[in-house]
Amino acid sequence: MSRNELFDVTVIGGGPAGLYSAFYSGLRGMKAKIIEYQPMLGGKVHVYPEKMIWDVGGLTPISGAKLIEQLVQQGLTFHPEVLLNEKVESIARNEEGLFELHTAASGVHLSKTVIVAVGGGILNPQKLQIEGAERFEVSNLNYTVKSLQHFKDKTVIVSGGGNSAVDWANELEPVAKKVYLAYRKDALSGHEAQVDQLLNSSVSCFFHTEITKLIASEDHEVIERVELTNAQTGEVMELPVDEVVINHGYERDTSLLENSRLDVTRVDDYYIAGTSNCQSSVPGLYAAGDIVHYEGKLHLIAGAFQDAANAVNSAKRFIDPEAHKSAMVSSHNEVFKERNRELVKKMFV
């Protein structure tokens, strides 16, 4: 399809909120497009593919990877156009009242409405500030834990003390040979239950301590030891390790709204201030998922689904004020008639 083709709705972001927005747009007969910055759909769930997710209504415990698979399958039900590896750099409105989405790779995309579903935004991990550290990113310097199996029977040090660092240390503890955690402050700042679990486990913690040097193997290909320095005592020690995991927080890319020629009201200089129907301060522009802020907002995947449906319904009524307030429920929706016939056949084969 041509990028200048007009769409009813363009969804920025291909995570849970974006994928459900695409699905629900199809349910409402809207021509939809998803533009995703990453090379794959699924959003932040990719950060924890092996973790079990318990709080999606109607689903028994499911791994992040499996949830992504199902979200993508559902999101593509009505064949929205999908663009991957595309960053929307700004949003504007032309003289005809149409939205123009400017992307780095393919120029301008036209849409009657827009749903911003970028979650926490484009998050870049804060890198370890040690000269030459980047060369170990292809070997054993990690900024995420994608596979627990990768760390099986290894000695691992986690640097950081926030929610993700504590969570990773807890996840690795029963899998790895030994887990250490180094944190520059005197107390961990993760969730209380997770911190208690960590402090009562076999994980060895070094407080007031930072990684100050990476010591390479003889071939200089992997980290063999780390130098730890205690900021209070000045004590320096070396620790043999197989893997180094860094979680020092993330740098959030806020350029999308900052570069846009639209008066979008924001909260805390990032989140889009919205209504319970996910309407922003700009008519025709909506937000769903973690990016939107309103009273009573639920920051769960389940909440993202409701946001997505509300945003799509609002977009539909923006285009056609006479349209129904919501889509017909799927169990009685004619759009699924033939699909249901095929599914029923398979059930009784």
Swiss-Prot record:
Source superkingdom: Bacteria
Entry-linked InterPro entries: FAD/NAD-bd_sf (IPR036188), FAD/NAD-binding_dom (IPR023753), Fd--NADP_Rdtase_type_2 (IPR022890), Ferredoxin-NADP_redctase_2 (IPR050097)
UniProt entry keywords in alphabetical sequence: FAD, Flavoprotein, NADP, Oxidoreductase
Enzyme class: oxidoreductase
Cofactor note: Binds 1 FAD per subunit.
Catalytic activity line of the entry: 2 reduced [2Fe-2S]-[ferredoxin] + NADP(+) + H(+) = 2 oxidized [2Fe-2S]-[ferredoxin] + NADPH
Cofactor requirements of the protein: FAD
EC numbers: 1.18.1.2
Gene Ontology MF terms: ferredoxin-NADP+ reductase activity; flavin adenine dinucleotide binding; NADP binding
UniProt-listed Gene3D superfamilies: FAD/NAD(P)-binding domain
Family designation: Belongs to the ferredoxin--NADP reductase type 2 family.
Self-association and partners: Homodimer.
Protein name: Ferredoxin--NADP reductase 1
Organism: Bacillus licheniformis (strain ATCC 14580 / DSM 13 / JCM 2505 / CCUG 7422 / NBRC 12200 / NCIMB 9375 / NCTC 10341 / NRRL NRS-1264 / Gibson 46)
Lineage: Bacteria, Bacillati, Bacillota, Bacilli, Bacillales
